[in-house]
């Protein structure tokens, strides 16, 4: 005879890193608390809401950034904990217990990271309002607020939603915008995926990153990191902690604990600094070009002569200018780049030589 176990439904499109981490956080709570829950989640980790009220079980943890899920759960008579982004207006929150990623803290972390690097021009690459991504609208709002408070000039480009049929057009428009930005601008992208668009366009336009433009994303999405030549700095969300807190709160609701409507904001974990914001305040065009060449080719066995050929000036001239701007010789910088690349690979990859 089976003892009574709570049946819990998770409604997430866990084909995305953020959603997967929330689900992992739920699992971590189950392991820590030894809760006897039967978890239902679709085998392909996609949220399906057809006839949802017929199979919800005893409680729900759901992605309330998804408007369709939020609407489908209206008037459902089981305990619900919503998970999603924070809002600057209290009335924007859904009328359920809610665990939120702190959008203000996410954008502020990226902004402060760029400031610490010496950047004093800022831009934001978001998503169009037609995308329906409310968290993107909130992050853009935070960016505008931060640059206004700090008396900086901030530029916003929402861009286009991308699909195979409009990909090249969207990238061309992004290229047009990037070419209007002054050198030494720091760009905060609303997600890592949008940041990758920027890195691709910069590579095509031969805009050196981070020497001329710095780029930072949000999500710390590993897949994006491996798909870009320039390693992307990113703000890691506290998604696992969100899942953990959501499960903990649902447990209290299942135990019939009386409480007011809960809204819990979860801060980001930290900024993961990588090459895309490894900014040095360089002003000499020849040194900027040399640094960019070294960063992209140091591990290909290049020597000082190859750097000179790429820049097109004499050794004595470039060595003098390089020493004045960077404080190192060209040879020393090539060696330092090799060591940094090796260190980064040791930390971040899991490849085994068979």
Predicted regions and their residues:
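Key DNA-contact positions within bacterial/archaeal DNA-binding proteins
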Residues: 316
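Sequence-specific DNA-binding recognition helix
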Residues: 349-354
